[in-house]
């Protein structure tokens, strides 16, 4: 019997387009013999959730601007309220796969709605998603857990920061300015003088009202690990990968990631001494646990080639990209876990976590929702 899977994609975020690409790869990785996939597109401008036609095997979802609006019903056990020419209630979905990047999708908002709906979903819950999304909060939690982080300052509406102040506090003239709640390097700038700094702040404030100002780590190597939590709760860490940006870009920004096909080289596995790779992988697992993550995450670290102790946890991404150049699926593929098996593992974790929540009274069993919604038999054709 195939499981009914809702694939959430799009979203009201600057990473909307990246989500669409990721969703196509996730859809193709879901075994059609095991899963019946129904995409739900989230409009970038309005935030409306719209039901898409079920996918044929190998088909990628496409953004739709018309069609029925939908919402998961609180206490509905995975049922959708469908508002088209008439109103109806869908048959329940067994699991939701959110392929959403950035605010309004990766930050705990959607996860909270899915918890209220009583439906299993892939990835971290509300706390882990929200904590990892806010880079300031994440760094505080990791620092409190004894993890090494790059020194930084926070700027915002009530806290202005001048370039001279940042240089003195962070002991570096070269700084990174970035929105606290954004991914895919959107809004990130590298600066080395006051003019660049002011421009970078204005650019970052276009995406968020909280801004991080970080000390640059000269010639830092960016090492990434894919973390996967099994259905039994075991936290597994992949071999390391390395991002080597092209010299023309200077750092791994949005253009290097998604615009320039030669913007960076992905080195899998990264060339690290075994002991160093093990140490950095251990830090990745600790970061995953410090932020209360679940299911999956990509953990990015910096390695200072001039300092044997220069290892820093940069950030934790709880819904990493699944594009053709995304490190998370590539790392697991290189470790022998192909995308279809990876998706099987993620869905198994989602179902097992939800079952544990039911067993401890933190979620209602599907049977309770079935009984409550039995009078409403009208459903959409899927």
Curated annotation (Swiss-Prot):
Q: Which cofactor does it need?
A: Mg(2+); Mn(2+)
Matching SUPFAM superfamilies, A to Z? Glutathione synthetase ATP-binding domain-like (SSF56059), PreATP-grasp domain (SSF52440)
Name the top EC class: ligase
The protein's superkingdom reads Bacteria
Q: Which residues form the signal peptide?
A: none
Q: Could you list this entry's UniProt keywords, alphabetically sorted.
A: ATP-binding, Cell shape, Cell wall biogenesis/degradation, Cytoplasm, Ligase, Magnesium, Manganese, Metal-binding, Nucleotide-binding, Peptidoglycan synthesis
Principal cellular location given in the protein's record:
cytoplasm
Catalytic activity reported:
2 D-alanine + ATP = D-alanyl-D-alanine + ADP + phosphate + H(+)
Q: Which residues form a coiled coil?
A: none
Q: Which residues bind Mg(2+) 2?
A: 315, 317
Cofactor binding summary note: Binds 2 magnesium or manganese ions per subunit.
Pfam families in alphabetical order: Dala_Dala_lig_C, Dala_Dala_lig_N
- For this UniProt entry, what's an example GO CC term? cytosol
Q: Which GO terms describe its molecular function?
A: ATP binding; D-alanine-D-alanine ligase activity; metal ion binding
Tell me which residues bind ATP. Answer: 168-223
Q: Where does Mg(2+) 1 bind?
A: 300, 315
The protein's annotated pathway:
Cell wall biogenesis; peptidoglycan biosynthesis
Q: Which GO terms describe its biological process?
A: cell wall organization; peptidoglycan biosynthetic process; regulation of cell shape
Span of domain ATP-grasp: 139-348
Query: What does this chain do?
Result: Cell wall formation.
Q: Tell me the NCBIfam families matching this sequence.
A: D_ala_D_alaTIGR, PRK01966.1-4
By what name is this protein known? D-alanine--D-alanine ligase
What lineage, starting at the top, does this entry show?
Answer: Bacteria, Pseudomonadati, Pseudomonadota, Alphaproteobacteria, Hyphomicrobiales
**Which gene name does the record give?**
ddl
